[in-house]
Design a protein with these regions (language model features):
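Feature activates predominantly on carbohydrate-active enzymes
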Residues: 90-259, 263-277, 295, 299, ...
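Hydrophobic faces of well-ordered beta-strands that scaffold small-molecule active sites
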Residues: 148-152, 179-181, 232-236, 278-280, ...
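Acidic, contiguous N-terminal accessory segments
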Residues: 15, 20-143, 270, 307-314, ...
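Active-site neighborhood of glycoside hydrolase catalytic domains
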Residues: 245-323, 327-334
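Active-site beta-loop-alpha junctions enriched in small/polar residues
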Residues: 155, 184-188, 237-241, 283-285, ...
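Bacterial N-terminal signal peptides that target proteins for export
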Residues: 1-8
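Flexible, acidic glycine-rich loops studded with aromatic residues
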Residues: 328-478
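Aromatic, loop-rich ligand-recognition surfaces of beta-strand-rich domains
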Residues: 481-486
Length: 486
């Protein structure tokens, strides 16, 4: 009996080590469940069986240093199944990944789950050090929230298509699945109009004049997002934030003439964007035409699109809008309408070292996971100030570190309290769960800074080892030559 107890104790210890070992693999976001096993899958000759993403899997094998063969004892097997047991939310993005010395097996309900499993495999490859082998393990994983995204305000400050693609591609490796494209602002209308080309004329832009996206570039970006399992949400802000529209047409959007023009532009937008949602803004404006918003929502819906709107903004009744995006502390989710939390998620307001702590620790809309009424979170860069270089836009907003923080929180769920309660300071107790969790995240994030973000604007440095000693003001009596005591 004593021997049995010792055996069970050792077995439990190794089981625990395998689970805790996931952190050593630098997976980000951390999977919901990860059990490590002994051994490695070595990439050599192997068979591939997959009903989806065949080209992507072939590329994966090549990048790992393997080759495909009709006959091999080693194999990669992708299986679409009806359900994965014990997944509480978002089955469509869930997956189970099993790696043994001879097989890699991915089980998922939909293509998206297969794609996220592949991103986990890429991270296992990168973290493992050796290019052609993967740690044996079983990972069961799913996102706590179905919307995990970022917004670029290109209406104020243009970003090249190449830069947008770079951000989308990089962040999809961390399971970010939504790109919100804020295309129009007071400064400029950045989407080409073939019906009204004067809308894109330099004379009607007050910042970065002449810079806009062609309709072909927009279509290409939609396709690029789809290839990376990212939902693109185009926003045409109305009736506020529309000075560029007024400069061009000499009509307010809420006027009869303005509404006629806007509907023609929406025809063009809906035809260009093969996406399910169109964002129509409706924030920070005085409504002078009570029919404007209901009529525009109905018009977009008749084009086969669902409509997203800011909150606070137009006061919708139940069923009048398909999704709301909360942009200030006054924004409130409503039963029956899915909500996106963007209230304290303004990267342009963030401090490099303080706010990332609050961002990582805070629960999304103070909830542990999403629901029918809580879709998720979108981080935003609002370019209120002109920053002329793309590099500086990304650097000064600390874009990538903050996006990795929200990538983990939106995927894992949970957290502690909310921004306005828990603050931006780490607890003094280094043994506390909050401190330990952030330290673990910081370690994994800095690993990616070193191994994946070389040459990219990534301003964050380690801070969990920094100790602050706050004292009273030094009584120098106004004499600046006095020396501060040791």
């Amino acid at each position: 009996m004593r021997s049995l107890r010792i055996f069970l104790g050792i077995a439990f210890l190794f089981h625990t080590l395998y689970i805790l070992g996931a952190g050593q693999l630098h997976l980000l976001p951390q999977p919901q469940q990860c059990i490590l096993a002994k051994g490695y899958f070595v990439m050599g000759k192997m068979r591939l069986s997959t009903p989806v993403l065949s080209q992507e899997w072939k590329q994966f094998v090549t990048e790992m240093g393997g080759t495909l063969a009709d006959q091999s004892a080693s194999s990669i097997n992708i299986k679409l199944i009806d359900t994965i047991e014990n997944i509480p939310v978002n089955q469509e993005e869930a997956y189970r990944l099993t790696i043994t010395p001879k097989t890699i097996t991915v089980e998922a309900v939909a293509e998206r789950g297969v794609y996220w499993a592949m991103q986990t495999l890429f991270q296992l490859k990168e973290a493992g050090g050796r290019r052609n082998r993967l740690q044996c393990c079983t990972i069961t994983d799913w996102p706590a929230f179905r919307i995990r995204g970022f917004m670029q305000d290109v209406g104020r400050s243009y970003l090249s298509v190449e830069e947008l693609k770079r951000e989308i591609a990089i962040l999809s490796r961390f399971k970010i699945n939504t790109f919100h494209w804020h295309l129009t602002e007071n400064q400029a209308w950045r989407l080409e109009s073939k019906i009204f080309p004067m809308l894109n004329d330099s004379i009607n832009m007050t910042r970065m004049a002449g810079k806009y996206y062609t309709l072909e570039e927009a279509k290409d970006l939609v396709a690029f997002c789809k290839a990376h399992q990212v939902l693109l949400i185009p926003e045409i802000d109305m009736p506020g934030h529309s000075a560029a529209f007024i400069r061009t047409f000499r009509h307010d959007m809420q006027s009869p003439e303005g509404m006629k023009i806007l509907k023609l532009l929406l025809d063009e937008v809906c035809e260009t964007f093969d996406v399910p949602y169109i964002h129509i803004g409706t924030d920070e404006v005085q409504f002078t035409n009570p029919q404007f918003v209901p009529e525009m929502v109905a018009y977009v819906r008749n084009k086969g699109k669902k409509v997203i709107s800011w909150n606070p903004g137009w006061k919708y009744k139940a069923g009048e809008i398909d999704m709301m995006q909360l942009w200030s502390y006054r924004g409130k989710a409503r039963q029956g309408t899915p909500a996106i939390d963007s209230r304290f998620h303004y990267l342009n307001h963030f401090d490099t070292f303080g706010d990332i702590i609050a961002l990582y620790n805070s629960r999304i809309y103070n909830a542990d996971m999403g629901s029918d009424d809580l879709a998720g979170v979108i981080m935003g860069i609002w370019n209120d100030r002109l920053i002329d270089k793309e590099w500086n836009m990304i650097l000064e907003n600390n874009f990538y570190p903050n996006m990795l923080a929200i990538a983990e929180r939106a995927w894992r769920g949970g957290g502690t309290e909310y921004f306005d309660k828990q603050g931006t300071i780490l607890p003094a107790d280094e043994k506390s769960e909050v401190f330990s969790n952030f330290k673990d995240f910081e370690s994994r994030m800095l690993w990616y800074k070193e191994h994946m973000f070389k040459g990219y604007p990534f301003a964050y440095v380690k801070q969990t080892n920094v100790k602050w000693n706050i004292t009273d003001a030094f009584p120098n009596e106004g004499d600046l030559t006095k020396v501060f005591p040791p």
